[in-house]
Swiss-Prot record:
Residues 161-213 form the bHLH domain. The keyword Mitochondrion does not apply. GO terms for molecular function: chromatin DNA binding; DNA-binding transcription activator activity, RNA polymerase II-specific; DNA-binding transcription factor activity, RNA polymerase II-specific; E-box binding; protein dimerization activity. PANTHER family: BASIC HELIX-LOOP-HELIX PROTEIN NEUROGENIN-RELATED (PTHR19290), TRANSCRIPTION FACTOR ATOH1 (PTHR19290:SF82). It is found in: Nucleus. SUPFAM superfamilies: HLH, helix-loop-helix DNA-binding domain (SSF47459). The keyword Transcription applies. This is Transcription factor ATOH1. Efficient DNA binding requires dimerization with another bHLH protein. Gene3D superfamilies: Helix-loop-helix DNA-binding domain. SMART domains: HLH. Transcriptional regulator. Activates E box-dependent transcription in collaboration with TCF3/E47, but the activity is completely antagonized by the negative regulator of neurogenesis HES1. Plays a role in the differentiation of subsets of neural cells by activating E box-dependent transcription. GO terms for biological process: auditory receptor cell fate determination; auditory receptor cell fate specification; axon development; axon guidance; central nervous system neuron differentiation; cerebral cortex development; epithelial cell apoptotic process; inner ear morphogenesis.
Amino acid sequence: MSRLLHAEEWAEVKELGDHHRQPQPHHLPQPPPPPPPQPPATLQAREHPVYPPELSLLDSTDPRAWLAPTLQGICTARAAQYLLHSPELSASEAAAPRDEVDGRGELVRRSSGGASSSKSPGPVKVREQLCKLKGGVVVDELGCSRQRAPSSKQVNGVQKQRRLAANARERRRMHGLNHAFDQLRNVIPSFNNDKKLSKYETLQMAQIYINALSELLQTPSGGEQPPPPPASCKSDHHHLRTAASYEGGAGNATAAGAQQASGGSQRPTPPGSCRTRFSAPASAGGYSVQLDALHFSTFEDSALTAMMAQKNLSPSLPGSILQPVQEENSKTSPRSHRSDGEFSPHSHYSDSDEAS
């Protein structure tokens, strides 16, 4: 009997075990799920119908859930649309929001579909895409738009303008210089009218012409023309003499030479020194005369041409028109020729002039 009861009890226990084994998974204690991330207050107030509850299914460890609070400053609705249509979501999770999104969501899906990859894009790329979709709105806080450096075209334009301005200034300067040389060529005489003088030749001819005019003004009208000075005294020709003294009376050149030889009041001139034509002191019978350009009568062109013809070099040397004739007995200083045809500033002066 006891054995039969034991079998009946075993059957009851077995039935109870089968009965309790089926609902057993429903009664097991389960850990509470982590609280879903709460959407921002601005999102609940403004874009609540566009922000579906599918975002609550995201785990707190999912990096896509971290992007939502980062993007709440620009456009939260677009951030939600980007998260819902990211390639990480499965087809079942993304089916409902695809039906609810509007035309803006379609643009987001088209732009994100071309740039989809195995990894979800970082917050910087998401920020740039959302800023582009907002229609060019500038957000200075997030740095979506940056000030662009001046392009190479603008820099090249500025450099071209400066170069053109410098070229124009140099062109005006050369035109003014050429005009001044043309005016100088018109006033100086030229023996070869067919050939246009160069700038260097024009300056040399102007120097010869000025020296000839100064000698003509310094020559007395009734007296004998004194001999020309040596080349070392050419610096004296550049200054006009305002006063000159000469001896009067009926004395001739022989008497004057005898007076200079016998008289002890005058100091003899050394052979190497520079003698001027009118530097001798006036004698007892002499008197000084103030020379003025207005007191002289106008000279003829033939006299000036003959005077300048005496200053030309021999035809065998090049540039004979430019250089005056040098006396054989005069002491000349060597000229330092340069490669460009110019002379040094002290080429026309001797060492004795520089020392004095």
